Amino acid sequence: KVGCVVVGVDREIRSTGFNGFPRGISDDLERLSDREKKYPLICHAEENAIMHAARIGLSLKGCTAYVTWPPCTRCARSLIQAGVIEVVYPAGSEVPERWIPDFEMSTQMLDEAGLTIRKA
């Protein structure tokens, strides 16, 4: 349901990611349908895109991340540390109420770190 595409300065795709379990971890129905089991295992889309780039030795410094939702604080930290300079997500994204405080904090983090946040 959630994806991330990271593009370089020439708008070339540098990396992609989606919400899912780490390599080698079975994504069976029992785990996927139980939040208590799923959430500790899941890698967020932004994390997967960053880790994929790192795995193949590709820097994301100066890149733009296009994401399905505003990033959570966990992903905001990773985007900042990876050197991403802009985050773009759809305008009018309806964020579930339980995530609003986390998304507000992540927006503050991205802003304080000097990243551009754009709703498109």
Which positions does each model-derived feature cover?
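Zinc-dependent deaminase catalytic domain
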Residues: 1-120
